[in-house]
Amino acid sequence: MDLLVDELFADMNADGASPPPPRPAGGPKNTPAAPPLYATGRLSQAQLMPSPPMPVPPAALFNRLLDDLGFSAGPALCTMLDTWNEDLFSALPTNADLYRECKFLSTLPSDVVEWGDAYVPERTQIDIRAHGDVAFPTLPATRDGLGLYYEALSRFFHAELRAREESYRTVLANFCSALYRYLRASVRQLHRQAHMRGRDRDLGEMLRATIADRYYRETARLARVLFLHLYLFLTREILWAAYAEQMMRPDLFDCLCCDLESWRQLAGLFQPFMFVNGALTVRGVPIEARRLRELNHIREHLNLPLVRSAATEEPGAPLTTPPTLHGNQARASGYFMVLIRAKLDSYSSFTTSPSEAVMREHAYSRARTKNNYGSTIEGLLDLPDDDAPEEAGLAAPRLSFLPAGHTRRLSTAPPTDVSLGDELHLDGEDVAMAHADALDDFDLDMLGDGDSPGPGFTPHDSAPYGALDMADFEFEQMFTDALGIDEYGG
């Protein structure tokens, strides 16, 4: 064991590494070095990753990644994905071109060895909340601009995702470097022990065999939690900011009808419209209320805004219903790994010769010892033509509006953690709420504040989201804390 430790520190000295920064003083040992979880709606706050990890066992390396991300709930969320059949990820862009030059993802162990021996970990500060060059869109003044708003919000999401994924790619490379150096030190230790026992073995062959046996499996494990953090936190951040604006403009969505190209557009994590009160359909077929409740159950557990539709929801029914798991159908975890494998296989697919490409396309000719990042049943499914993933993505939803006089309003208020009425207690005293019941029968129309505002009335604040000052952000955070938006954490 001492020799193994010496080997690890010899590797660190050779690479010019410095010890990792200490954890915050005065706190428990497991205090994360990363900043707290994302504050809802704050699109400009940076999150800098600590220095690259040391070569440690894979389990410790995995825990270090969770600690650096502040993502302790990551493994539980990965397990939760295995209990749902919804395709939450196929509508997201793969951005596989970002990984075409990532040699550390090669399925040839010799490439990994060559890369690992030469790679110097990136020690500059890595901001995993980097931003793209597209501005956050604001809601239009009239409903006629909702189509352009949908496209603008989608472009903003894709730009933010690509900018942040470049940072996540660097983080993955640093952790793969630490993993490789640990495996290399372990193999050298075993090689010395074998030599002392009179059994000479080839060091290079031992290292390549170890990489084939452990490196790809552990890399896929790291990538799974890393990219789940990317997709989930970015989607939360953008959608809660958009939700806060859309909730204040019900006039834009009361008559909105949205016809989707595929159910995947509604089941996906990123859903630009969270209020569609006119009609919500997939190729002209209305969405069932039960299906919408099941989808919202998943979104609630992922701490994403619910999708609301007055035309679909049943009056008096709950907003969420636990979905039934069908063991013979694809699962969300499988769809997620299909997306991850598109990234991990990008380098090998891009550098593969034509003859190797034929072997990759035909399962009967694949080598049984071929290294890979695992497989899922979802990769073997024959999807129907109307739901098959396309490189160009799905078409934008077709928007229309109900005729005048057919306005629909939600019958159920958004769920919050704020309780009123007989559950309200002031300073420990019992307060009679009987007189407050009169408010239920109070007609607000007597105040002249009906659905049609008077002349000169501005229905919303036209200031762009990015123009808010820090005082606005602080008030917004107090408001979201009261609603329990960050309740689920991680």
Curated annotation (Swiss-Prot):
Which region ranges are annotated with the description Transcriptional activation?
411-490
Site described as Critical role in activation, located at F442
Tell me if Ligase is a UniProt keyword of this record.
Answer: no
Q: Where in the cell is it found?
A: Virion tegument; Host nucleus
Sites of the modification Phosphoserine? S18, S353, S411, S452
Record note on domains: The transcriptional activation region seems to target many proteins of the RNA polymerase II transcription machinery.
Q: Quaternary state and partners of this protein?
A: Interacts with tegument protein VP22. Interacts with gH (via C-terminus). Interacts with the virion host shutoff protein (vhs). Interacts with VP11/12. Associates with the VP16-induced complex; binding to host HCFC1 activates VP16 for association with the octamer motif-binding host protein POU2F1, to form a multiprotein-DNA complex responsible for activating transcription of the viral immediate early genes. Interacts with host P-TEFb; this interaction recruits P-TEFb to the viral alpha-gene promoters and overcomes transcriptional inhibition by ICP22 and promotes transcription of IE genes.
Supply the name of the protein: Tegument protein VP16
Query: Which species does this protein come from?
Result: Human herpesvirus 1 (strain 17)
